[in-house]
Each structure stands twice: as structure tokens, then as C-alpha cells.
Amino acid sequence: MDLYCWNTEISAAFYVVLQFCELSIRNGAVEAVEAVFGPNWHLNRGFVYTLPVLRGNRGYQPRNDLQSCAARLPTAGKVVAELKFAFWQSLFVKGQQARIWDTHLARAFPGYDRALTLAQARTQMFDNIEKIRKLRNRVALNRPGFIGDL
């Protein structure tokens, strides 16, 4: 029981910080996408078709998620709020480097490590978002935090 209580306390401590991380990443990504595809980026077919589609319909499908949200929600703001965190991570794949990040990474994420190339910074962002996403899911699902590194 002590470990369960400790895990609950650790999860609560991480929750607010993880929410701020998610919002910061999401808002930076939205800023960059809007700069390239305009304020109605969620309806822009040119943008939609740049999103990855996993073969065999296995795993998270960012294109399908965006199309589903855009079809039922009236504004970009509502779409932004509804998209999964994995959607924002999917924008940091190599295929979006020249399209979005070469020209907008520094403005959207001014604190990035400038010792890195833009491609390295984008890759680092993807990897760090993956760590944040996994920790967030552990916290949200109340999985034991005392197993493995926090």
C-alpha cells in the first residue's frame, strides 16, 4: 500500500508539468503549421496529404485523426484541442523537415539547442516527445512509476 500511495504522489507531481509540456509542444507545432499552411491548415488538403499513413492501418493514423476531427468540429481551435498528443509528435518526422521545420523550428521553439543542426533538433524533439508521451500515459493510467527510470 505504501508503494501505491507513493506512486500516486509521484504521478500527481508530474501531471501539471506534463500538461505544460504538452501544451507548449502543441502550440509551437500549431504556430509552425499555420505559418506554412494558413489558419485553416486543418482543412488544407496540401497539409493533410503530408501526414503519415501507416501500412496495414496498424497504430495511430495522424491523417485519419485530423480528417475525423476536421469533419466534425467547426474551428481550427476545436480541432487542435481534440487531436491526440501523438498527432503533434507525428509532425516531427523526417518528411516534415523541409516543409515545416527548416524555416519554422527556431520561431516555434526558440529554446532548442542551437549547437544542433535543424534536422538533429527535429529528431531530438521527436525523441523527447516520445519520452514525454510515454511518461504522460504512465501517469494518466496510474501505472507504477517506481518501475524503471522516471
What are these regions (language model features)?
Residues 1-150:
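Amphipathic alpha-helical interface elements
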